[in-house]
Amino acid sequence: METLSYSQIKKRKADFDEDISKRARQLPVGEQLPLSRLLQYSDKQQLFTILLQCVEKHPDLARDIRGILPAPSMDTCVETLRKLLINLNDSFPYGGDKRGDYAFNRIREKYMAVLHALNDMVPCYLPPYSTCFEKNITFLDAATNVVHELPEFHNPNHNVYKSQAYYELTGAWLVVLRQLEDRPVVPLLPLEELEEHNKTSQNRMEEALNYLKQLQKNEPLVHERSHTFQQTNPQNNFHRHTNSMNIGNDNGMGWHSMHQYI
């Protein structure tokens, strides 16, 4: 076995170092953060804005995103409406006439935010998209209570928005109630609740109330039909529902017309 002297080892090391120095050094290049990191450090509002901009530029993305994102629960929708209503009430100026033009101009943006939210959410609880009568009624009841709490003003022009909301709620009510015409099992009709809604709205929901009264008048026929159905399907039970309802125009699509007002 060959034994290397110190001088030989030193020479070999020098030759090796010389080879390294002749190699092309790969230097780093500046670049932005990876997309995953950018998303991690972006706040929710930024991501929301970016997503909407991408959908506007690439409409096909909307279908894919709808297929991925889960629909919000009813509780979430109602909570959103309540928060918007709180923001509206908190935006009133301190002191002064809260029914005057100045007050309306101060709260107008928050007022419209409530209407826009209703405009987006109500159709999600109407057939044919939503066919569950009880769920539809529950949401419409909550939405009606929100409209009841919208402020009114001395200037009748400022009250057009609320009147239109009642009109649309009435139509949605009619659409949901008409689901019962073909149902073999009919839930308990919430007549008292709708009467209270109509009273609070100053008879602006009378059309839906009259329709519900007509349903109640035909209730013996309905129950006879239901009894026959139960005899052939004994496992089915009557659905009991004590909540209320409301919203829309004759064909249930009236919320689309809200855009001309807001």
UniProtKB/Swiss-Prot annotation:
Q: Which InterPro entries match?
A: Cut8/Sts1_fam (IPR013868), Cut8/Sts1_sf (IPR038422)
Q: Which Pfam families match?
A: Cut8
> For this protein, what is any one GO molecular function term?
identical protein binding
Compartments, as annotated in UniProt:
Nucleus envelope
Which GO cellular component terms are attached?
Answer: chromatin; nuclear envelope; nuclear periphery; nucleus
Task: State the UniProt keywords alphabetically.
Answer: Nucleus, Ubl conjugation
Q: Which family does it belong to?
A: Belongs to the cut8/STS1 family.
Q: What does this protein do?
A: Together with nucleoporin alm1, tethers the proteasome to the nuclear envelope. Involved in ubiquitin-mediated protein degradation and facilitates the degradation of nuclear proteins like mitotic cyclin and cut2. Required for normal progression of anaphase.
| Summary of subunit composition and partner proteins | Binds the proteasome.
Q: What is this protein called?
A: Tethering factor for nuclear proteasome cut8
Q: Which gene encodes it?
A: cut8
